[in-house]
């Protein structure tokens, strides 16, 4: 997505003579946000990451930041059937999904499924503290694998500047990106 995105933006910049676009300035005929929503199980999401269908390391995203406690609480929330916020991804021309919002959540799931951390400081399911995915009771493994995430996909035909605008809007409300992370968005 990175090279094709830059090619699309550069081609448009060459045509307009502008370096940066405001989404309102994009010609109306290409200013369409095309999305599709899916309900994906945790098991499916982990498999998609393993197969390279979801990119957990896009250039424009920050590194993994969550401490084990926060990641553990996400796992506990899934086991307790607590709704998890929507994950937003942008589809590229190869049909790969690049994470726009939800990278920390997906990374936490993936790391847990790969036994990279033990559950810690759980508040409700405290009997699971100290366990990795491998050591979870079979019922808990099934419940976790069957947990559902809503995924909103910005389809490949969506103009790159519209995708960028969505990224900016989603990532200016919670933990703010630093200036370098925001600049990296331009080169995704």
State where each predicted segment sits.
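Basic- and aromatic-enriched surface patches that contact anionic nucleotides/nucleic acids
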Residues: 2-44, 58-188
């Amino acid at each position: 997505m990175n090279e094709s995105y830059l090619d699309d933006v550069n081609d448009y910049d060459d045509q307009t003579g502008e370096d940066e676009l405001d989404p309102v300035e994009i010609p109306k005929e290409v200013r369409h946000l095309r999305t599709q929503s899916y309900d994906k199980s945790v098991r499916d999401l982990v498999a998609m990451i393993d197969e390279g269908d979801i990119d957990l390391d896009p250039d424009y995203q920050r590194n993994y930041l969550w401490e084990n406690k926060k990641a553990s609480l996400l796992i506990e929330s899934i086991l307790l059937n607590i709704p998890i916020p929507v994950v937003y991804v942008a589809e590229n021309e190869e049909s790969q999904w690049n994470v726009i919002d939800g990278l920390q959540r997906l990374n936490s799931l993936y790391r847990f499924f790969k036994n990279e951390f033990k559950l810690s400081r759980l508040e409700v399911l405290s009997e699971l503290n100290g366990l990795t995915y491998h050591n979870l009771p079979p019922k808990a493994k099934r419940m976790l694998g069957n947990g559902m995430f809503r995924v909103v996909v910005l389809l490949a035909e969506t103009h790159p500047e519209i995708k960028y605008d969505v990224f900016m809007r989603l990532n200016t409300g919670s933990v703010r990106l630093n200036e370098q992370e925001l600049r990296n968005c331009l080169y995704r």
